[in-house]
Amino acid sequence: MQKLFDEIEMPVSRVLYEMEKEGVLVRRQELQAYGDALVDRINELETKIHEAAGCEFNINSPKQLGEILFEKMGLKGGKKTKTGYSTAADILEKLAADNPIVADILEYRGLTKLKSTYADGLADYIEEDGRIHTSFNQTITATGRISSTEPNLQNIPMRTELGRLIRKVFVPKDNYLFTDADYSQIELRVLAHISGDEQLIEAYKSDADIHRITASKVFHTPFEEVTDLQRRNAKAVNFGIVYGI
């Protein structure tokens, strides 16, 4: 432990200090334009949702939304709780394919989250030097991973087109570039080495897709027929085992 502290943790703390001090440059005007674009789309969706429902209501109110969807519009699959119908994402996602209003509501929720958390939230952290100086936390997570707060710059969206656009407001200083480097499934490779699991070792030696292999076995599906969703779920299981699922 002393060796780990002296040779890894202490040198890393200096690097994190330099990263916090340097910060990351943000294009304030582009961030504002991004927020404005979100507002335009949010307003479009709000109008669309109200028209489909036949009345105006507070889309952000779970109680009102539940009553509109499951009582006024008669959608099937509603789950009633003590406080009203559940409008949790997992409930609505099951209804979205057959009910356009539900798909619009899910998009509305996603965009309002982007607006409040990123378009508005990040703007509050831009300092006089035009940079955001996040805090990197070295000793908070149980897994030993570094976390980021005020704001969290390690969780910038990338799954949707609008989500990815937020990344474009972060820019390097003149004559510099951003680079991206990531170990390929490092935790599972370490697990293969420590455990000595022959199948896992062979999978990595042959450059096989370990997540697709797991999905194939878990879902009893031929390897070639594994869907992207099944692979993502298997990936969560694989890494979950490493982190104590």
PLM segments and residue spans:
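Generic long, charged, amphipathic alpha-helical segments
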Residues: S206-N233
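Conserved "right-hand" nucleotidyltransferase catalytic core of DNA-directed polymerases
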Residues: M1-E161, L177, S184-E187, S216, ...
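Short, polar/flexible loop-turn hinges at active-site or ligand-entry regions and domain interfaces
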Residues: M1-Q2, E198-Y204, P222-V226
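A short, glycine-centered helix-capping/turn motif at helix boundaries
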Residues: Y243-I245
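Residue-level signal for well-ordered alpha-helical positions
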Residues: V169, H193-I194
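A short acidic-Thr-Gly-centered motif at the start of a beta-strand
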Residues: L162-L177
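Conserved, non-catalytic sequence blocks in retroelement Pol enzymes and Pol-derived host proteins
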Residues: I59-N60, A203-K205
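ATPase nucleotide-binding head domains, primarily ABC-like/P-loop NTPase cores
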Residues: D180, L188-H193
